[in-house]
């Protein structure tokens, strides 16, 4: 069995599947440890699952997050208690921890390696995979955990790949004066910025911005000063924080178009199956849950068709609506008028805000 991509979905799937007796090889284009653009807030819906499977990194002191702060583009904010809450942890630490566990438990890793071509051979009922190191593999099952956007999406001719997206993602780690129990979402014209505590007293500062604004101002730093700093709360964070990296992690072409959980017999996991808007704060939990779903499908399905149908059905029942709600409410964020409406809803009709949160999150599993 081959897993393409070593993010949360791929790593957790490898750990679950090797425990079930599968021989698992995982291909990852980078070499651990490394940073990823990610909000680094994990919903507590995964807490029981992680502890039950001995995957929770209890050697780290992680901040417990139970409050949501929302500010509009003018910097006026409102707070809302979170029913489930969550915790903050960097992908640098979490991915490294899961990678080390998987290596110890027998997962074979091909790091610094990419898949250059992938075809399903109907007659042989096998996948043929070509790797960047010129290896050619033939395997019966391939899991696609290659993230938001990959060259494999182009190889598979997935429809979203040809649609340009205006969104960019930018992430920093900082030292700052902030509340460790609060995850904040600060709006600015054209996007929004998440801010929450992670391990070792650090904070994650990660925002979804607009490519056109970056072009207009010529650099990330100038765009931040001209656009993000118009929200006084963001201006204060940027001015008063100690930035721990020389330059941020940046990704482009972040696309929230619908995707399918199964493409040409590939079982898609995490962001490769569907990317939830970051404002929902649920991508990391969904990645881990999809790993569990695919493990259950492979256990219970007797044929390829049964596995694919089982996985598609369960994936859609749990995530399809969640992704749709995220896309629908995205318009309330990153605009002056929309963010004021959202702030007023949270402040004066908290029931609506809680309903939206419930519809973008799942139950503990």
What residue ranges belong to the model's regions?
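N-terminal Rossmann-fold NAD(P) dinucleotide-binding loop
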Residues: 10-11
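Predominantly flavin-linked oxidoreductase catalytic cores and closely associated redox partners
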Residues: 101-234
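FAD/FMN-dependent oxidoreductases across multiple families
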Residues: 215-294, 305
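C-terminal helical "tail/cap" subdomain of flavin- and related membrane-associated enzymes
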Residues: 296-365
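Short phosphate-binding/catalytic loops that engage adenosine nucleotides
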Residues: 22, 55, 107
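Glycine-rich FAD pyrophosphate-binding loop
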Residues: 2-6, 15-38
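A conserved beta-strand/loop capping segment in the N-terminal third of enzymes
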Residues: 47-99
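Redox-cofactor binding/interface segments in oxidoreductases and associated redox assembly factors
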Residues: 4, 144-145, 268
